[in-house]
Amino acid sequence: MKVRPSVKPICEKCKVIKRKGKVMVICENPKHKQRQG
């Protein structure tokens, strides 16, 4: 899980979602998981 000020999809399989007001990226590749904050 990467925590960064701006989250962007890295590959085609990355999905940008909102959970509890936080923007997150979920993906098949665990290295692509990101959270804003």
Curated annotation (Swiss-Prot):
GO cellular component: cytoplasm; ribonucleoprotein complex; ribosome
HAMAP family listed in its UniProt record: Ribosomal_bL36
UniProt GO MF annotations: structural constituent of ribosome
Name this polypeptide is given: Large ribosomal subunit protein bL36
One biological process term in Gene Ontology: translation
Organism for this UniProt entry: Staphylococcus aureus (strain NCTC 8325 / PS 47)
Similarity section: Belongs to the bacterial ribosomal protein bL36 family.
Transmembrane segments: none
A Pfam family hit: Ribosomal_L36
PANTHER family named in the record: 50S RIBOSOMAL PROTEIN L36, CHLOROPLASTIC, LARGE RIBOSOMAL SUBUNIT PROTEIN BL36C
Record InterPro entries: Ribosomal_bL36 (IPR000473), Ribosomal_bL36_sp (IPR035977)
Coiled coil: none
Domain of life: Bacteria
Alphabetized UniProt keyword annotations: Ribonucleoprotein, Ribosomal protein
Higher taxonomy: Bacteria, Bacillati, Bacillota, Bacilli, Bacillales
